[in-house]
Amino acid sequence: MHTEDTQIANLLIESGIIKDRELQEINLLAKNAGLSFYDAVIDKDIVTDETLGQMMAQSSGYPFVILAKTAIPDELFHLTPEKVARRLKVIAFDRDQTSIKLAMADPNNKEVIEAFAKKTNSKVIPYFATDKDIHNALRMFRKDLQIIVDNLLQEEISKSKVLSADEAPITKIVDVVISYAYDDKASDIHIEPEEKSSLLRFRIDGLLHDVLRLPKILHDRIIARIKVLSRLRTDEHLSAQDGKMNIKTEEENLDIRVSILPVADGEKAVLRLLASKNRQFTLSNLGLCDHDLTKVNKSINKAYGMILSTGPTGSGKTTIIYTILKLINIRERNITTIEDPVEYRIPGANQIQVNPKTNLTFASGLRSILRQDPNVIFVGEIRDNETAGIAVDAALTGHLVLTTLHTNDAATAIPRLIDMKVEPFLVASTVNLIIAQRLVRKICDMCKIPLTVTLSTLAQYFPMEMIKKNLGESLQFTFFKGRGCKICRNTGYSGRIGVFEVLEVTNEIKKLITEKRDAETITKQAVKDGMKTMIEDGLDKIARGVTTLEEVMRVTKVES
């Protein structure tokens, strides 16, 4: 363990928060999920970021500051260039005539302290602040993207230059747009031609937000720049093109998948950001409760059978499969996947890209995989009867098969497989677990406020029995919402989490499958067996202040 990790571990053990066994679990989680020890502690909800920060500050003998609750003068923020502040994880937050207070992730960094003392001609008083708090403070002071781009354009207009795709301003505009999208944890960038302008939008937490409007004359040049970076044809404007690029950020090399499509007013580009720093998921931080975690862990440790992840497009199906694959990825196992596309690389796994031009389909690829001595197989999606049949046969003959289906709930996956000409007895014999999910936006921690909701309001959305079971007997309840702040773009939400229903195929459910009973009957039996429905999991997350009633209703309206 690193020195800081050892310090954190000792603090948690000495304070009685964890025992040696839990320390081993945290170390294993950090290793499997690619998290730092600090982040693994936070992920397991052992302590909050703020509490752990206070403990570390007290242990190291430095005062602790919460920047989110501190009014920082603009002039102090601008003492340090933003890139430097991000790299060093420092921010000045207060000063008087003789001294300056400096929030630092590493207050022992004498070099930084001396540099600030020399620059400001003041005594530097170092404070400890968490990485997350410093990052959010820097975001609060970040210049608006529109202002930055307008300034870049104004500089060139003053030079009376006509801009081409490889001119510095166009290059800088593309770079700064990607940098802002990455920092905002956007999944996609949309660059859309309009009649008189070019509109840029970021998809953040599943929803699109307008972020920038440019003169129409720049649109083609920006598209051309993206084509150059993606190695696409710059002279082709009437056909769709797909490509990819790699951009180096301060934190990682960022893979970006690019789609160019001709539309009415020009060419539209969509850039999918495949950021590994935002993909350090664990089953718990995806939103699975302890009860469901137990069921998932039981199934993924079986040598054979099938695990299905179901839900509409964009509901997080592939994310949970990737997370499971990372957990079971050991050298003694041969993990082989066939995907369309391969979005994220899994070290040690053999990942195959579907290619219809060479007749490499899900079905043909799956047949070939079975001759490669696999232990674990991931099929990106079951789209047809042939793939369904081969996948079930693979699960029946000693392989653990993970795959996805488009269904609204867990139980509906069973009749869907039967509709794909898989015999009911084969479905009953092979399917171990079905995970259905949706993604809800999480309430922003920076602007969370309490909210009173009456029983009569809740009863409009949830069965009374479910309310009493999960919340107890009361006429009103205290939930939470986000007021809206700069960190969350005034939406009240920041980040997403899953709401789940995890259906374990018990002996009773196997019997219902062989009898070809409908999804509703299977769901009722699964609930008897202890399954928490998706809407019930949503209610639990509302009660715990994770998300809001509006969010749960938005994504589970089919069920409600």
Model region roles, listed by residue range:
Residues 407-506:
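Cys/His-rich Zn2+-binding cysteine-cluster or related metal-binding knuckle/ribbon modules and their
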Residues 12, 41, 102, 116, ...:
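Residue-level signature of catalytic and energy-coupling elements of molecular machines
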Residues 1-4, 458-463, 554-560:
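Short, charged, intrinsically disordered terminal tails
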Residues 62, 72-74, 82-315, 320, ...:
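N-terminal "pre-motor" subdomain/linker immediately upstream of P-loop NTPase catalytic cores
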Residues 1-114, 119-124:
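Non-catalytic accessory regions
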Residues 466-560:
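NTP-binding/hydrolysis catalytic cores, primarily Walker-type P-loop NTPases
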Residues 293, 297-307, 313, 318-443:
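Switch/coupling sub-region of P-loop NTPases
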Residues 5, 34, 49-53, 70-77, ...:
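Amphipathic alpha-helical transducer elements in NTP-driven molecular machines
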